[in-house]
Amino acid sequence: MAKIVVALGGNALGKSPQEQLELVKNTAKSLVGLITKGHEIVISHGNGPQVGSINLGLNYAAEHNQGPAFPFAECGAMSQAYIGYQLQESLQNELHSIGMNKQVVTLVTQVEVDENDPAFNNPSKPIGLFYNKEEAEQIQKEKGFIFVEDAGRGYRRVVPSPQPISIIELESIKTLIKNDTLVIAAGGGGIPVIREQHDGFKGIDAVIDKDKTSALLGANIQCDQLIILTAIDYVYINFNTENQQPLKTTNVDELKRYIDENQFAKGSMLPKIEAAISFIENNPKGSVLITSLNELDAALEGKVGTVIKK
């Protein structure tokens, strides 16, 4: 039996609550399949599109005197509940359909970051909707948001993405796992908080990369494998070119060389690769699987996906 952290990509979860729910239902079947095979899993998820949409909607309401403005940390908490609820419901229904009595819990999770992290001066995490260049330039002019081109898919707003230091609710996660509970935690990389005097915490405007927090979680609970589910079936080098090549198996040294060659897009594939390297360096016997949400079953059979080992 293996202990596995499964990290679901926010971009792979669809563009609307309805689309997300359908995708989550299908994913639940694959995740429950892991459980029926005897594996112990913990689930994390991204929230880039979702938290951006929540923040955009609330800001629009505030600008039109229809409600208060909400800080980004609170928007992150809302996205954890929204995505976690749909995952939780789908998993509960799937478990019930096969007669398995197992509790599923979504845990609102805070993650400590350093307020002096250089990421706060260099926003890099894409969030929210995709725009064409003209739309992005107009919004940037009106609101002062920073936009970047995102892996050939359009322009998106970017926000700071500091490194995760510690998971505040880690001991609660461990307790739930010990009590045979299926845990959904660290959604969106966790709600970013900074440590204040007397060990208090305060939310800060940022979005932590969910794969980096998932790698930290995996190391902290000593899991055997980290599965990163995204929108593409393999990790590629020379991505979106005539020489595009999938990586079926690779290792840490090879990936570091590809990073030096700028093979992985900042804000999309690069943090996934950095998370994979971090996980394996902290857990040399572990492995990482990166593939698409829709190909999880095939990937678990070794038919698709990128496998990374030491």
Curated annotation (Swiss-Prot):
GO biological process, one term: arginine deiminase pathway
Single GO molecular function: carbamate kinase activity
Coarse class of the protein's main subcellular location: cytoplasm
Catalytic activity: hydrogencarbonate + NH4(+) + ATP = carbamoyl phosphate + ADP + H2O + H(+)
Pfam families assigned to the protein according to its UniProt record, in alphabetical order: AA_kinase (PF00696)
EC number in record: 2.7.2.2
InterPro entries: AceGlu_kinase-like_sf, Asp/Glu/Uridylate_kinase, Carb_kinase
Gene Ontology cellular component terms for the protein in this record: cytosol
Pathway noted in the entry: Metabolic intermediate metabolism; carbamoyl phosphate degradation; CO(2) and NH(3) from carbamoyl phosphate: step 1/1
Family label: Belongs to the carbamate kinase family.
PANTHER family xref list: CARBAMATE KINASE, CARBAMATE KINASE-RELATED
Protein name: Carbamate kinase 1
Gene of this entry: arcC1
